[in-house]
Design a protein with these regions (language model features):
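Glycine-rich phosphate-binding loop used to anchor ATP phosphates in small-molecule kinases
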Residues: 62-83
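Short beta-strand segments
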Residues: 3-5, 70-73, 95-97, 172-174, ...
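Short active-site oxyanion
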Residues: 1, 67-70, 92, 223
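Short catalytic/ligand-binding loop motif for oxyanion handling, primarily in non-cytosolic enzymes
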Residues: 12-15, 78-81, 101-106, 180-182
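PAPS-dependent sulfotransferase catalytic core
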Residues: 1-64, 112-117, 123-124
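PAPS-dependent sulfotransferases, especially Golgi type II membrane carbohydrate sulfotransferases
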Residues: 1, 116-119, 123-168, 172, ...
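Conserved phosphate-donor/acceptor-positioning beta-strand/loop module used by diverse small-molecule
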Residues: 87-107
Length: 241
């Protein structure tokens, strides 16, 4: 199973929750997998699929998890989702969708895309305002020059768009529903997994919903305007207008 979606959308919680179900194991964000993704973008799906399967099979063997159904939760898998699902024909993708305004708020707080940020993530991919591999060709300089809020909204838009690429093999979980009505959020996931709905509901019910809607409190009018300008169409399409 691949849990995908934008960073700060609840992918970590969802991956851990589903990985705790009987017969499953949470693989967390597999670092070699995450590090390989930028170089696989644009490769034919069959080529990328072979590389991804090789990485994950090695990790599963080393982690003694070969007898369980793995739950991989790297958000960047969104950009190679078709290849990942080709590598594992029986796998399901779970796309965790959260209000992009709340995601932007959280990304601004973390500072991963901020002009002043230094350092790197767990896959040694650097933080800061530079253009990531998912920025549209020809817009790299623009990305580095816009406001932090615009970059945060840009990231959310690109991730949710990419994660929607294989709808026939993807279950969608809205973070807001997950925290307010775990049973409703769990039902389609349980059905696709062939799992007991009550078990999925129970693990989803452990989510904390205090961060839902925090953009109303934490974003400045200028930041909100930047987010709406960059991602307004995507927000509206997903019901967050």
């Amino acid at each position: 199973m691949f849990v995908v979606g934008s960073p700060r959308s609840g992918t970590t919680f969802t991956g851990r929750a589903l990985g705790s179900l009987p017969g499953f194991v949470d693989l967390d964000e597999v670092q070699p997998w995450k590090a390989a993704i930028p170089g696989l973008l644009g490769q034919p799906d069959d080529v990328a699929a072979r590389r991804l399967r090789h990485i994950l099979q090695c990790v599963r063997m080393l982690g003694l998890a070969s007898g369980l159904r793995g739950v991989e939760q790297t958000p960047e898998t969104s950009f190679v989702l078709a290849a990942a699902l080709r590598a594992y024909p029986d796998a399901l993708a779970v796309h965790v969708v959260r209000d992009g305004r709340d995601v932007a708020t959280s990304l601004l707080e973390r500072g991963w895309l901020s002009a002043e940020r230094t350092g790197a993530d767990d896959a040694r991919l650097p933080f800061g305002p530079y253009a990531r591999f998912w920025v549209e060709p020809g817009r790299e300089q623009e990305f580095s020059e816009v406001s932090d809020a615009t970059r945060a909204a840009w990231a959310w838009r690109r991730y949710v768009t990419a994660a929607s690429a294989v709808p026939g093999r993807t279950a969608v979980v809205h973070y807001e529903q997950l925290v307010s009505d775990p049973a409703a959020a769990a039902a389609p996931v349980a059905e696709r997994l062939g799992a007991e709905p009550g078990l999925v509901t129970a693990v989803f019910a452990e989510a904390h919903g205090t961060s839902a809607g925090r953009w109303r409190r934490d974003l400045t009018p200028e930041q909100l305007a930047d987010v709406q300008r960059e991602a307004g169409d995507a927000l509206a399409a997903l019901g967050y207008a």
